Amino acid sequence: MKKIFLAFLLITAMMTFAQQDNFEISKSLSIYNNVFRELNMNYVDEIDASELNTVAIDAMLDQLDPYTVFIKESEIEDYRMMTTGEYGGIGAIIRLEGDYVHISEPYEGFPAHKAGLIAGDKILSINGIDTKGKNTQEVSELLKGQAGTTLEIVVSRYGEKNPITKTLTREKVKIDNIPYYGVFDNNIGYIALGQFTKNAATELKTAFIEMKQQTDLKGLVIDLRGNGGGLLKEAVDIVNIFVPKDKLVVYTKGKNVQQNSQHRTEFEPVDTEIPLVILVNGGSASASEIVAGSIQDFDRGVILGQRTFGKGLVQNILQMSYNTQIKVTVAKYYIPSNRCIQEIDYSKNKKKTTDSIAADTLGQRFTTANGRVVYEGHGIKPDVEVKIDQMSILTIMLYNKDMFAKFADKFFYEHKKIASADKFAIDDKLYQEFIDFVKEQGFTYTNESERILSELKKTVKREGNETMLSDEIDLMEKELANAKADDFNKSRKDIVEMLRMEIVSRYYFQKGKIVTSFTDDEELHEAFNVILDTERYNEILGRNK
């Protein structure tokens, strides 16, 4: 009798909470409807009801997390492209420079490339529409369209006096999941995985098998740096290439039990023994973290680089009225050690900022298959951490002001061909040419020391100490000017790397940029060291116990 009574109390309590929730929802909707109606009837100026409604919805969703968003009808195609990696267009990356959008990088083999458009081309008009003052999103919408349709584009080009007119036929553009793969001289394979759209796992599997057939691979490096994620199924299937069938890779848990699911490996693996290193950094998120975290939890490979982003949330896209959608966070995902890698608890952290306290002191401890300790939350901590020096202010400002791109445009006009991507180098003469070019462009920048000194001068003046400290401040300004004159020497390594990639991309496109980046890639070289040192590799994975 007591059990029946307790059950009755529990059911009654649940019904009461449900009724309260329903009342609050009805109340809120009624208030919103009344406010909207009164604004429409009484506000002094005409209001755009659709725009006002979108702003209200966005403000509401902003209280939750960055991934729960309202998708307007005009944005649906962009979200479809994020899933499939396909869109109808000309196949080019664009960038804003001044008042005009420029071609930043045409995709090799697609309409922009086939029509002869090159990096640096300034887009003047599209189908007769002047593009001056338009942003990249607006220009992108003009360039995109159904495959098979044509467009006329007018561009100006460095070194050409007159505008150039091109007629292009749009195609279905497929952004490569794998922009590059290949085998190095040390017989270590490398696969750069840029995203997890449809068929990513199949493409990676095909590339891996092809390399295995070409040579006796000593190991494999999968590069997930900067990969923000994508389809969960593709992540699971990629793990499946390296671990046995029927292994639990990830499971999800949400408020509604319908969102709870388990995702296991379904096929026989390709190779469960080859030494494996996964490269990650702060831009590796979501599906990338499922792959890296699962490989780490299974002790199947070594994770190398910097701590990952920490996105352990699952979203579903739900259909709404009037051809709109809402992408909703419905669950958290957990990897084989049972840890969740989510960095921020958005229910408690409305500012959506990370905590500065050391991550390992906060997260719950879990263990891998071999008993290694790993921690929950805060992304995936690499087994081998490689610290990357922060890029200098000078290099950042040169990039932000398009100095690398502008010089590359000039260089491409003056040089019809260069050495192969892996052999092209920036020598002293070319580096000085770049410095001279930058000065001719009137480039200026303020470094951190100058900014602090400027603030100090304001404070000294405000406090009436200007006369007393003027000599000291003048001396500091002279010393800083002398030090700044040497900035191009101090930042040479970063500048050379950026400049080389920009120039190489004009001749060898995206693959060339990747190949030329290998020269200075400390993480890749450390990955080679780990793979080639069998004892170290096994020790990292806890296999020597």
Language-model regions, residue ranges each:
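Bacterial Sec-dependent N-terminal signal peptides
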Residues: 1-23
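Polar, glycine-rich mid-to-C-terminal structural blocks
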Residues: 287, 299, 306, 310-372, ...
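Residue-level recognition of conserved beta-strand edge/terminus positions
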Residues: 126-127, 377
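Structural motif
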Residues: 120-122
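Extended, small/polar residue-biased N-terminal targeting/export presequences
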Residues: 43-104, 148-170, 175-180, 518-528, ...
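Cleft-lining beta-strand/loop regions that shape enzyme active-site pockets
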Residues: 18-28, 32-49, 72, 102-106, ...
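Short linear motifs in exposed loops
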Residues: 105, 134, 167, 329, ...
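Conserved functional hotspot residues or short segments at active or partner-binding sites
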Residues: 340-341, 345-347, 351-545
